[in-house]
Amino acid sequence: MFAIGNLDERSEKIMRVTKECVELGLKAAKPWGHLGDIAHAINSHAQANGYSVVEEIGGHGIGLEFHEEPFVSYVTKKGTEMVLVPGMMFTIEPMINMGKDAIVLDKANGWTIRTADGAPSAQWEIMVLVTEDGHEVLAY
């Protein structure tokens, strides 16, 4: 993740906390665990720092197509969602907001997502492979 221009302390903090959320989610990515374990780690840390996690933006499976299943939510509970099986590849890429979790789609380009309340936001993405004894980061 990088910033454009000079950042104030609040912006530096949300970038740092977002990276920490991803790292905590990664620690929870274990074979025979659940996607919800990753969500719990991310959401708990974001909320503990006064931030919200966007429900509609999540990670995705990696395969032959762009954005394959499973959808990796960051607002589900520990011990829920799909079981993490060795060989699974997916992204961990939460969108963490300073304000509320609501977002809007830029209708001009049909791609850009903005916070509905105009508050700053940060996103960090990694690609993970679940292995027999843990995980491997494929892209950071």
Feature roles, as predicted:
Residues 1-140:
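Active-site neighborhoods and metal-handling regions in enzymes and metal-associated proteins
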